[in-house]
Design a protein with these regions (language model features):
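Conserved beta strand-loop-helix elements of the APE1-like EEP
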Residues: 61-78, 214-235
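N-terminal, active-site-proximal structural segment of metallo-dependent hydrolase catalytic domains
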Residues: 1-49, 60-65, 158
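Active-site-proximal beta-strand elements of phosphoester/diester hydrolases
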Residues: 1-10, 105-120, 151, 254
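Surface polyanion/phosphate-binding segment centered on an Asp-His-Pro turn
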Residues: 240-261
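Surface-exposed cleft-lining segments at the edges of enzyme active sites
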Residues: 82-87, 113-131, 168-172
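Active-site beta-strand termini and strand-to-loop segments that position acidic
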Residues: 70-71, 97-103, 229-230, 252, ...
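Structured beta-strand-rich core segments of catalytic domains in phosphoester-bond hydrolases
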Residues: 35-38, 42-118
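Metal-dependent phosphoesterases centered on the DNase I-like endonuclease/exonuclease/phosphatase
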Residues: 50, 130-223
């Protein structure tokens, strides 16, 4: 079975892309970020016609997350969580559910991590505070759910291999020491970066700036991740960044990242 994450940068604009990609990939669970739509206009019916259910938390213009699940291979989720508990936040950045699958019950957490804007600013402080609370939440969830996957746009490139020009980015947002330390903190809970379970070629990224021909020049970063618990780690058969949707007309600046169990 396949689990994937994709920052679609507006579901209203990118819905045809999502539907086309689901049709060809037959992904079982797809986590989406940056919906940029409110819940009342979420495309429940369109997705249902394709055989997908969804849980979601949206807001106008910004943020928003969803988990789509293929109804013929995955049961409807239980124990749904919207946003981080005990963290007052109007921004819709997290949704979680427990899904019964062919690989057993999987606690699936979809997150749109704060960008942080610029090192040292208020948005950066918010990002670090959010990451601290996320770590506490994931630690608690791991105690209840042996099979756990944390999928999303992390807005963190874990190390220099994940940046097209490390020297140019050094110390900046997405790669600052504090952000990378927060990523390592998640790994220290017992999670593994599914992408690094395999030998990967150099220069593989999940996001490219729209400006300056970023995609065409492969000036990108790997900031979209799927971390898996030890119980899931042994079941991961492959991990692949699918660049195809980034080549379509009016694409998201991100592309799907997929693992297969």
């Amino acid at each position: 079975m396949k689990l994937a994450t994709w920052n679609v940068n507006s579901l209203k604009v990118r819905l045809p892309h999502v539907m086309q990609w689901l049709e060809t990939s037959q992904t079982d669970i797809l986590c989406l970020q940056e919906l940029k739509i409110t819940d009342d206009v979420f495309p429940v019916n369109e997705l249902a016609m394709m055989g997908y259910g969804a849980i979601f938390a949206g807001q106008k213009t910004y943020n928003g997350v969803a988990i789509l699940y293929r109804q013929d291979t995955v049961e409807a989720p239980t124990d749904i969580q919207i946003n981080l508990p005990d963290f007052t936040d109007e921004q819709k950045r997290l949704v979680a559910g427990t899904f019964e699958t062919k690989a057993g019950a999987i606690r699936t957490i979809c997150g749109y991590f704060p960008n942080g804007a610029e090192v040292g600013c208020d948005k950066y402080a918010y990002k670090l505070a959010w990451l601290v609370k996320l770590q506490s939440f994931v630690k608690e969830e791991l105690g209840k759910h042996p099979q756990l996957a944390l999928l999303g746009d992390y807005n963190i490139a874990p190390d220099d291999r994940d940046v097209w020009n490390p020297k140019a980015w050094e110390g900046n947002i997405l790669v600052s020491p504090a952000e990378r330390a927060a990523f390592q903190g998640l790994l220290q809970l017992g999670l593994s970066d599914s992408f690094r379970l395999f030998d990967q070629p150099e220069g593989l990224y999940s996001w490219w700036d729209y400006r300056m021909l970023g995609f065409q020049k492969n000036h990108g970063m790997r900031i979209d991740h799927i971390l898996v618990s030890d119980a899931l780690k042994t079941k991961v058969k492959s991990a692949q960044i699918d660049k195809t949707p980034r080549k379509w007309e009016k694409p998201s600046d991100h592309t799907p990242y997929v693992i297969e169990l």
